[in-house]
Amino acid sequence: MRELQGDDSSRKSPPSDSVVKNSSPIDYEHSLKSLQDERTLNYPNKQFNSENPSSYYNMDDSGELCNFELEKDSLESMIHESSTALSAQSNTAQDGDQLASSSTISKDHSETLDNKLNDSKILIKKASNSFANFSESVRSSTIVAYSQTPTQRLQGLTSISSSSFDDGSYGSRRISFNSQGVSGRLRRNMDSTVIIPSEDEDLQLPSNSNSNVEYGPFDSTTFDRQLSIEVNQPVGAMSLSPCGRDIALASRYGLLVLDLDNPYNPPRMLRHSTPWEVADTQWNVHAARDQWVVSTSSQKTIVWNLALPNDRAIEFMLHGHTRAVTDMNWHRQNPDVLATCSIDSSVHCWDLRSPRFPVNSFYDWHNGATQVKWNYKNPHILASSHGRLVRIWDDRYGSAPLHTIKTSENITKINGLEFNRACETRLLTCAMDRTVKFWNYEKSTEEPEHLITTDSPVWKARFTPFGDGVILMPQRGDNSVHMYDCRNLDKEGPRAVHRFAGHTDQVKEFLWRCRGEDVFDRDLRDFQLITWSKDHHVRLWPIGNDILNSMGHDRTKPVPFKLTRLGAKYRTYSREPLKQSLINTECDSSDAMNSFDSNFGAERANTSDLSRGFVAFANRKKSKYNLPGSSGFMTRSTKSTNPMTPLNWLRGISMGRLGNADWEVPQNLGEELSWIGQKYSNVSFEKIDVAERTCTISLNAPILPDDGYAYIRLHVYFPNNYPISATPVFQLERSSAFNDEQFNYVFNTLTSISDQCISSHKYCMDACLSYLSGNLSVDEIWKLGFQKDNSDSSSESSADIFQDVFPSMPDFRGGDRGLSHKHQNIPLPKTCAAIFCGNDELVCFFTIKADESAAQATANRETHGRQKLFESFGVLDSSNSVADSDSTNYDDENSLNRGGTSESDSEFIWDVDESNSGSIVFPKSKTSINLNNINSASASIMGSRFGAADIFMSKRPSTKGSNRPSILLSKPSHDFHVVRIISMSKYLPVKRALAAEYVVDTGDKVTVCNKNAEVSAKHNYYRLAKVWLMLGRLLGHLSRTENKDHINDEEAFPWLKSPLAKWVVNSLLDYYASQCNTQMLAMLACVLDIPNPKKQSGNTSADQVLFNQPKQVTEKLGVQLNLPKTKILEKVSSHSLAQITALREKEPKDADSTYSKEKIFSATSTVHLQLMDYDKQNNDFVDAQEIAYTKLLQQKFIQWRATYAEQLDLWGFFIPKLEMLKFNAHEFSSPSEKTLVNHCNSCNSTTSNTRICEKCYSLVPRMSCTFCCLSIHGLCIVCGLCLHVMHEDCYKEWFSNGDSISQSCSSGCGCKCQFQHMSLEKV
């Protein structure tokens, strides 16, 4: 037999086709295959490399390559098996020699066996070296997959390549790994996207307590429910993870990662402070890179790796733009390719495998880029929007665009752009011109296929992932998201399918969350809409089958397009990865609870990294440039005004109910902790983790004798079956403040209370904290919470039952425990209150004791079952009624007749417990409110039942202070809360009926007086009718006798020439001012007024004309009307060049309505316009006084009309309101006499055309365009009447349409700016 040679040089290549089968039962291939099969059996998720037996690699579900460390026993077993294979081959070789000597085996066969023996020798040698290195280094490095040659890469690593593409310029690159020692810092291959941590940095995501249970999207508790989450952060963009479980909210303070399946857990905060708003954030849409999130930071682009710790989560920082980045989009086929666009008109394509420079760039050279999107079908096509143009680019075509789509003839801005998922050449655009256009650039780039025209500019428009439709999001004027069916655009046009209403401010982003994508032959996907609004709320909207069917969704057909999210592992990145060395997997349940650190605890440990800034994409070693305070990137220290504590986070979550679930009972552990956290203000929640079902609370509890307090810290662990069958585990920390006997008493009492709550399937934390806070004794808790309704059915008394449940224990508090500490830590509730509404109604509530009749009525109602109560959410509307559909079951006094339809007072009484005395509650009706009709007059705001689909329209029960009723209470108390709505119309001088029919202006003032006299007589106000008739005759006489050509233009009021007219006007104004009748004062101001007079000096500003009056004239008039600042007064001069300083008077405190505490007119103030003596010899002096008198009276007229216009707005009379405000617009001077001034918000002074106030030296804000709402720099167009300003281009665009809407001012003030004098000013 030949000597076995271990040198590789002695090896010969085996023959390719002259292999003779060996008769031995064990050959080389069989032994090696057996070794591989055993390795596969022991490690089913691992792969064995036959070329290198000491190397293994692991493939997870997402296609990523994971690390796998060889254990000692694995190496020993491998060496033993290899030795066995070698021995078998040696025996085979001996047999081969014998056969060769007998000339039965050929020479070639012997050489083949020798080569195989050499291979076995080499295999054992490599395994022994690996084991020796493993023992010497004491597991100092991680052994990972190692590919030596390109051939081995293709053979062994084909399955773990990034992805494969069809002839794309962004082809896949094979991943190479280095088996050499890894340093202590985090290292990565420049050509790889796989992080290779060292042994001491074995990172993993923290799992929940039930990590051994497979959790999927169909196990989600929030997918089928409406959910509202309040996030008090300046969030600029939102994105969704590939699996649909997490959302990323990007703000100026960093990145928030929120788990939608565990919304009660505070989000993970990756801090990065920046002074710039985040324009966009995008989660990687591919399953292979589900840990990547990209966001903008001015001209930079940040790529976050959520699989890394928070202090090193920034993996890449892309810097290629010179202006702010406006949009980003991941490639739809390649997970490593990203496209970004910027205001600098450039579009960059980045390959994150070499992120130093963009791999491709496109430029428009004229307009900045606002949107960029990759094609869903073609991996080489992408589109970008520049102004009103859409450029279609091909990365194989060069720098010139493939197609250019001109979306509009006018100057506009494209806000949204998206390709169709099913057709390669179709896309849609939405723009500021209030249109949504559908394009097919293969057919035409000039005319769209279809067009949708809306009432307001469209901020975003996208195709729906189901059916054939679009979903639109307005930019302003509407806080809803609209869904349209687009199947019959040619014949019927778009059909509105649904309106998602509920946000109170503009919606900024919407996303689609789906599940059920793993079925290929049918489309069984479920959908949920996620929206983010400027009201700081994330809301989830389930999509029902009725909406899917109305959009043409067919579940029997397969999905018509490729799903990039398919195969994504359903996991969350809402928790920071923890190092393996910090996790103790062998601790028991109590130790695990004590050693558990919440997400906020981990965040506090990283607060030192707030100002660290970015770290280079590949160079992660620490240097002086990475130290706090020495960052080379722009950061800003911020201080949150509302710290996001766990309790504050819980308060902002509202989850819908399924079916007829009770709103007074928490539906899960998160709601229970949220409710009790708001009810008990003296309890401090140190740690809350709903996912791990633990919390830690502390408080000063009155558990010591003689009313003594002791500090208590309580750890609570809630099992999964709580509160159905499992009791929470309490761990009370011992303290020197109380002895062991007192400690045992408190602990046993808490356990007994929780056991009794669980026996009734009730939540127990409310009862436990009521006992610890001293609000209720154990006896009271038992009587209120666990006493049966039918008490006489048992022979035992409640005291006997209590003694059986709670054995005799010493009372360590001393005194009467039921009285000494009851409610001592809770402030007294408000038992009565009253407030005026804007519709002439007074709403008040108060508490009364129940009499016998009321008690009888309560008993009658209890026969029908206790009604569920919830707090009304809206403002009282006079047109709505809250009469229950089953009102026959109740007394007549329980119906609420609104004062808007009747002059009589209305009253509502309902039985609630005493702790709810500060809330206004109403019984639920049997009908629900449609989301589309929530603002209509037919929708009943109060007394309507909100189901699971209507939680955004309602508020859950009051949760402030102690107003929440105890969860334990099942019996109504003996107090009644009365809510009364009183109509005050007969006590107020202003009359709504008159305002509805009064005529403000018809051109002839005599006709106005006669018509108003008829209206007053019609409603039986005969005194007012006489006043109007008298005033009409007086003005008619003046118009006949006075020659208008001889009237001095500076005398604004022609009735000044008549002593009788002056006396009559003076008497009327004096009388109605004393009566506080703003209605008559405003109407008289309209009738007695004429267009504004000419000014004496062309250089005098509008403010000087109105308010620079001689002091003696003001004193002679003898009245100062202190009008409160109303909304109308603020809106009169909005977007104007000249601000009226007199109208910006101080706002009174607590002026919540028109009739506030500070009266519109002082009771002692009178308007006495003293007559002037025209017999004086100095006529010039008299004329000067008349001019001053006229200007001061104009000021009063403006204030009266503005106040009355505010009242008309509250009544809903918008046309008379605009007619009233037009008179105020006429009071300004003509455009030729205007000078450009700014108004300082700090000192209320007017300045010249400068940015710095000349009086207080504060920054004066620039004027904004009424069309695009952007600040104005340079030339602008100024209207001579309403004083609104617009950019020159915006002015041309607005008035170029030629429709009826664009003929008036773009601000909506009603001014016909196009036909008035327009002036060109420079700002």
Swiss-Prot record:
Q: Which residue windows does the record flag with biased composition (Polar residues)?
A: 42-57, 80-105, 879-888
A Gene Ontology molecular function term for this protein is: zinc ion binding
The residues the entry assigns to the signal sequence are none
Q: What are its GO cellular component terms?
A: fungal-type vacuole membrane; GATOR1 complex; GATOR2 complex; Seh1-associated complex; vacuolar membrane
> Which terms are listed as keywords in the entry?
Metal-binding, Phosphoprotein, Repeat, WD repeat, Zinc, Zinc-finger
Phosphoserine PTM positions read 24
Zinc finger (RING-type) boundaries: 1265-1309
> InterPro entries, per this entry?
RWD_dom, WD40/YVTN_repeat-like_dom_sf, WD40_repeat_dom_sf, WD40_rpt, WDR59-like, WDR59_RTC1-like_RING_Znf
Q: Where is this region: Disordered?
A: 1-57, 79-112, 879-904
Residue ranges annotated for the RWD domain, each copy included: 671-779
Domain of life the protein comes from = Eukaryota
Bias (Basic and acidic residues): 1-11, 27-40
- Output the GO biological process annotations, alphabetical, semicolon-separated: cellular response to amino acid starvation; negative regulation of TORC1 signaling; positive regulation of TORC1 signaling
User: For bias kind Low complexity, which ranges apply?
Assistant: 12-21
Q: Where are the WD repeats?
A: 271-314, 320-360, 364-403, 409-449, 453-494, 502-551
Q: Which family does it belong to?
A: Belongs to the WD repeat WDR59 family.
What role does it play?
Answer: May be involved in telomere capping.
**This protein is called what?**
Uncharacterized RWD, RING finger and WD repeat-containing protein C11E3.05
Q: Which organism is it from?
A: Schizosaccharomyces pombe (strain 972 / ATCC 24843)
